[in-house]
Every structure is written in structure tokens, then in C-alpha cells.
Amino acid sequence: MSLKAEEITSIIKSKIANFTPQADINETGTVLQVGDGIARIYGLKNAVAGELLEFPNNVKGLALNLETDNIGCVLMGEDSSIQEGDPVKRTGQVINVPVGDALLGRVVDPLGKPLDGKGPIKTNSSRPLEIVAPGVIERQPVKQPLQTGLKAIDSLVPIGKGQRELIIGDRQTGKTAIAIDAILNQKNQPADQRTLCVYVAIGQKQSTVAQVVQTLTEFGAMEYTVIVSASAADPASLLYIAPYAGSSIAEEFMWNKRDVLIIYDDLSKHAQAYRQMSLLLRRPPGREAYPGDVFYLHSRLLERACKLSDKNGGGSITALPIIETQANDMSAYIPTNVISITDGQIYLESGLFHSGMKPAVNVGLSVSRVGGSAQKKIMRSVSGTLRLDMSQYKELEAFSQFGSDLDKESQQQLTRGKRINELFKQDQYTPMPVEEQVLVFFAGTNGFLDNIEVNLVKEYEKQLLTYFKAEKKDLFEELKNAPEMSENLTNKLKEALTAFGEVFKNSHSTAQ
């Protein structure tokens, strides 16, 4: 078959007309130096701060230092496979994390990859790691309570939805235990109104995270919880982005009109990871060798917790950051920074913890700066004088150790203080509904415990709740639904507590 010259010409012309160039244009750079999870890259002149870079073997990096002739980049994976001279590509993207309901009940790393062996996470939604926190107009004041189920906190250091409340104390004083109890207590709410929880483990041992997962699963709390884990074995870069990833996951729920509780456990290790990265990137060190912007590191994170205005859906993020102190020193750099950013702190003391006071909340140094306006009126009516009573009791207790003779009124204060102090004690994983707390504190502050031996207070509390649920159902229900303590309700409670006092006295006199 012979082709004519015109046909050949027309074929060539059509091929030229339909030709589309397939060249893949990539801006690439070269690795100059790599080590300790840091790479220096030559080239990539148009890279922006915070951009995701792609290395060989599917390792990702985050551009942090943009210098005149090179880029300082932290690696999001193992650096042993990267060599000097390797090509590096720009992605033109910032880090995004998968978000949405598909993450509930899952354990993920800060990049959203599953760690629980339950298969891939099926979600099409993602959010950038870092966003600007909502502005003043987009927010509303904190006015709804968030119950933790812990008597010492809900009565004296109340937390509101949208608040940032710091949990601070030495190692092994029960900081994580408070956070886990707060998560467990959200199970008491109806499923459609339940506060969702995000637990961010930063630099924790993997065995500790496994223990948290097991506890939450046992109590049925994993179904409304997401765990973001950057363990002690992970690179500092993953520890650095973990809290921001947790915050992005929480924000998706918040903008969908949900309430979220997020726990950062703990921000001391987060600051240490950032210090490590900054020193390796040759940024100038400041106080305690932390970089100059370590305050901004935490302030931009914690400002993302808020209560949105009704116009924006009214969702909220309540943050409970945890800080570990050394030898009860709250005046160190990171603790003072985070105290000044948050809306109050729950201070746990090792001395109290070892003396058997659990949770070991130091009532004098713990404060909630905005939660008071969110506390339920009925709780405020019984706990209003508690803080003053407890501080007077502590003062008297110290004074009475000198063996001084005390007048009758002071002895009365000591007697009541000892018993109320006993009421603050609570076992782990036993969060208490607010109506039970109100009943117990009402009994304590109105003198119904004054004639009970201190070692029997716990037994009294247990039997009191059982008695009310069985014998005084209607009154207990009325207490549960009452917005505030009316005179009628007060009289009914006093009557019922007097009757129970006789029952308790008789049961113990016969037992003896």
C-alpha cells in the first residue's frame, strides 16, 4: 500500500495539532546534609515556610528554616535511607490531617495513619495542621458547664465549655488520671449531646498509651474518643505536630456544632521536642535553651480552643493541657508560660498524693478564671463557701499542731473540715454525676457528717447515695432536675438526711 505525499502531510499536521506536552515540571533541590532528623537542602528557591517536601523512599519533610542559600527541614520519618545528593521535590502543600466521624474509636499518628490495626480510615475530609484561631466576633463567652465527674474539680475549680484549664504537677501525681476520668464522665450524657473527646499523647511510652486505650475500651468510652499518639520512639518532628493534628481533628467536630474535650498529655515534652528541633536547626537559644518563640508555640495552639457563637453553630473545644513540673516548681519557664495562656490551673501536689489524698488537688493554688460563670447554680449554692472553709481548715490544722487549746468554734471548724476533706477523695475511674455531688456536699456543709467518724465518711457517702436511689427516688429526681436550691428542696433534703443519719447510726451500732 502506497501513501500519497498529501496524506502523509495531513497525518503529520493532525499529530502536531493534537500534541500535548507530557513533561512533568517539578521544582527539585538537593540534600546537602542530613542527620538527627534534620536535612539541609540546596535549591527550592520558591519553597514556603511550613511546606511539605518529598524525599526518596516516600519520606516527607517540613520546611522550617528558609535561609539565603539553603532550607532547614525536619524529617517526618527515618533519616537513615536519605543520603547527601538525594533529590528533594516541592509538593506545594502544607500538612493536612484526615478528620471526621471515621476517626472516632481509632488510634492514629499525627499524620492520620492508623496505629490500631483496624484497617485504613475511610474519610474524604481533611484539614490543615495549622489554622488561625477563631476571632473575637466568632466566639461567645464560656457559660455552659463541662462536668469532669470529680468532686474536687466540679465544686471548686469548675470548667466551662470552651475553656482552657491547665493540669499541672510533678510526675506520678495523677495528672493523666484526671484527664481520663473527665473522658469517662462524658458517657453519662445522651449519645446525641455527648461531648466528643480527643486525647493527644505526646512523647508517652507506647505501653502507657496502650493502657489508656484499654481503659477507655473497657468503660465503653472509645466510641466517642480519638487518640492521637506520637510516642517516645517517634522523631521530634512528629511530637511537634501531634497537638496541632489533635486540634485540627477537634475543630472539624466543633464547626459541625459539636462539643469537644481535648487533652494534651503533655506539653512539657512538646516544648522539649521543639527545643531539640530548634537547636539542631541552629536557631538561637534563649532561657533554659528554649527558642525565643516557645511561648507562641503554645499560645497559638491553645487559642484554638473556644466556644463558637450561635451564628457559627455554637460548637466548642475545651482544652486540658498537662504540664509536668520538677520538684513542684511552678515558676519554671514552660509552666509559667502555659499558666499565663490558660484560663486557670488544677495544681496537683506530690505531698498530698502520698498522704492518700486522691485526686491530689491543692485547693489553695488551683483556680478557674472563667468557669465560675459556667457552674450550675445548684452546685454553686452548696460549694460557694467550700474554698473559704477549706483554707480556714488548713490554717487551723497547722495551728492546732502546736498543741494550743482551741475554742469551741475552732474545734467545730476542724471537725467539719476533716470530714469535707475526706469527701474530696475519690477512686480512679469512678466519676460522679453532678446531682450526687450536690447531695454529698449538701450533707457535708450542713453538718450532717459532724458526728460521723472520719474513717466512716466514705462508707456514709456510699450508703447515702444507695439510700436516696432506693428510698427517696422522687426527691433524688427532683434534686437532679432542680436548676437551683430552693427553700422547699433544702427542707426536704435536711429531713431526708436526718432520717438517713438515724439509719446509718443504727446500722453501725448493731454492727459493733
Curated annotation (Swiss-Prot):
<dbReference type="GO" id="GO:0005524">
    <property type="term" value="F:ATP binding"/>
</dbReference>
<comment type="function">
    <text>Produces ATP from ADP in the presence of a proton gradient across the membrane. The alpha chain is a regulatory subunit.</text>
</comment>
<keyword id="KW-0375">Hydrogen ion transport</keyword>
<dbReference type="InterPro" id="IPR023366">
    <property type="entry name" value="ATP_synth_asu-like_sf"/>
</dbReference>
<feature type="site" description="Required for activity">
    <location>
        <position position="366"/>
    </location>
</feature>
<dbReference type="InterPro" id="IPR000194">
    <property type="entry name" value="ATPase_F1/V1/A1_a/bsu_nucl-bd"/>
</dbReference>
<keyword id="KW-0547">Nucleotide-binding</keyword>
<feature type="binding site">
    <location>
        <begin position="169"/>
        <end position="176"/>
    </location>
    <ligand>
        <name>ATP</name>
    </ligand>
</feature>
<dbReference type="InterPro" id="IPR036121">
    <property type="entry name" value="ATPase_F1/V1/A1_a/bsu_N_sf"/>
</dbReference>
<keyword id="KW-0139">CF(1)</keyword>
<dbReference type="InterPro" id="IPR033732">
    <property type="entry name" value="ATP_synth_F1_a_nt-bd_dom"/>
</dbReference>
<keyword id="KW-0066">ATP synthesis</keyword>
<keyword id="KW-1278">Translocase</keyword>
<keyword id="KW-0472">Membrane</keyword>
<dbReference type="GO" id="GO:0005886">
    <property type="term" value="C:plasma membrane"/>
</dbReference>
<protein>
    <recommendedName>
        <fullName>ATP synthase subunit alpha</fullName>
        <ecNumber>7.1.2.2</ecNumber>
    </recommendedName>
</protein>
<keyword id="KW-1003">Cell membrane</keyword>
<dbReference type="InterPro" id="IPR000793">
    <property type="entry name" value="ATP_synth_asu_C"/>
</dbReference>
<keyword id="KW-0067">ATP-binding</keyword>
<dbReference type="InterPro" id="IPR004100">
    <property type="entry name" value="ATPase_F1/V1/A1_a/bsu_N"/>
</dbReference>
<keyword id="KW-0406">Ion transport</keyword>
<dbReference type="InterPro" id="IPR020003">
    <property type="entry name" value="ATPase_a/bsu_AS"/>
</dbReference>
<dbReference type="InterPro" id="IPR027417">
    <property type="entry name" value="P-loop_NTPase"/>
</dbReference>
<keyword id="KW-0813">Transport</keyword>
<comment type="subunit">
    <text>F-type ATPases have 2 components, CF(1) - the catalytic core - and CF(0) - the membrane proton channel. CF(1) has five subunits: alpha(3), beta(3), gamma(1), delta(1), epsilon(1). CF(0) has three main subunits: a(1), b(2) and c(9-12). The alpha and beta chains form an alternating ring which encloses part of the gamma chain. CF(1) is attached to CF(0) by a central stalk formed by the gamma and epsilon chains, while a peripheral stalk is formed by the delta and b chains.</text>
</comment>
<dbReference type="GO" id="GO:0043531">
    <property type="term" value="F:ADP binding"/>
</dbReference>
<dbReference type="Pfam" id="PF00006">
    <property type="entry name" value="ATP-synt_ab"/>
</dbReference>
<dbReference type="GO" id="GO:0046933">
    <property type="term" value="F:proton-transporting ATP synthase activity, rotational mechanism"/>
</dbReference>
<comment type="similarity">
    <text>Belongs to the ATPase alpha/beta chains family.</text>
</comment>
<dbReference type="GO" id="GO:0045259">
    <property type="term" value="C:proton-transporting ATP synthase complex"/>
</dbReference>
<dbReference type="InterPro" id="IPR005294">
    <property type="entry name" value="ATP_synth_F1_asu"/>
</dbReference>
<dbReference type="Pfam" id="PF00306">
    <property type="entry name" value="ATP-synt_ab_C"/>
</dbReference>
<dbReference type="InterPro" id="IPR038376">
    <property type="entry name" value="ATP_synth_asu_C_sf"/>
</dbReference>
<dbReference type="Pfam" id="PF02874">
    <property type="entry name" value="ATP-synt_ab_N"/>
</dbReference>
